[in-house]
């Protein structure tokens, strides 16, 4: 499986993402600069965290206009797995691929520490290696990770089982403690915590590795079955 790691001005988690795929999983990964216009040669798309364009105007608001973004939307429409982490999640929201918006954390402070997540849906291509209700430890690093949506949108997320992860405790004021959601089709995941920073027990947790393993496992099953 071959992954594209999108690199924008201000990205700072692209190397971690590349390491998780290339070194920990042994899969192919390439950095793709934001000026590129095609992702056709890739099987999966990863949008890492950071501060794209300095978070000016609004997190992800400028990045959504990058040359590569139409190709990201095309990949999502084609059913390819698309993962956005932290700033990547915010960008996916700005693109309209995922619902909701991000506000400043409730205490107006930047949070950078390991947190408990609860796997709410283990039937997605990103979470199938976890158990439903499993408690995992993944680090966060954000100042604007307070997920917000209106009641109607929240009801839809719950009804469609689109909430992939919630926080074990309220860390930032997110509606329903939401930490990660998928689109209705289930092939686009956005999450504020950083699974790429939890792929080796030496770093405190390897719980994030299962997420990347799930992507590869489901991709292989699908492509072997259709080959």
Swiss-Prot record:
Keywords, comma-separated and alphabetical: ATP-binding, Cytoplasm, Glutamine amidotransferase, Hydrolase, Ligase, Nucleotide-binding, Purine biosynthesis
The gene coding this protein: purQ
Biological pathway: Purine metabolism; IMP biosynthesis via de novo pathway; 5-amino-1-(5-phospho-D-ribosyl)imidazole from N(2)-formyl-N(1)-(5-phospho-D-ribosyl)glycinamide: step 1/2
All residue ranges annotated as the Glutamine amidotransferase type-1 domain in the record: 3-225
Coiled-coil ranges (or none): none
Catalytic activity: N(2)-formyl-N(1)-(5-phospho-beta-D-ribosyl)glycinamide + L-glutamine + ATP + H2O = 2-formamido-N(1)-(5-O-phospho-beta-D-ribosyl)acetamidine + L-glutamate + ADP + phosphate + H(+); L-glutamine + H2O = L-glutamate + NH4(+)
Name of the protein: Phosphoribosylformylglycinamidine synthase subunit PurQ
Family matches, as PANTHER family: PHOSPHORIBOSYLFORMYLGLYCINAMIDINE SYNTHASE SUBUNIT PURQ (PTHR47552:SF1)
Compartments where located: Cytoplasm
InterPro entries for this protein: Class_I_gatase-like, PRibForGlyAmidine_synth_PurQ
GO molecular function annotations of the record: ATP binding; glutaminase activity; phosphoribosylformylglycinamidine synthase activity
Ligase as UniProt keyword: yes
Active-site residues, Swiss-Prot/TrEMBL: 86 (nucleophile), 194, 196
Role of this protein: Part of the phosphoribosylformylglycinamidine synthase complex involved in the purines biosynthetic pathway. Catalyzes the ATP-dependent conversion of formylglycinamide ribonucleotide (FGAR) and glutamine to yield formylglycinamidine ribonucleotide (FGAM) and glutamate. The FGAM synthase complex is composed of three subunits. PurQ produces an ammonia molecule by converting glutamine to glutamate. PurL transfers the ammonia molecule to FGAR to form FGAM in an ATP-dependent manner.
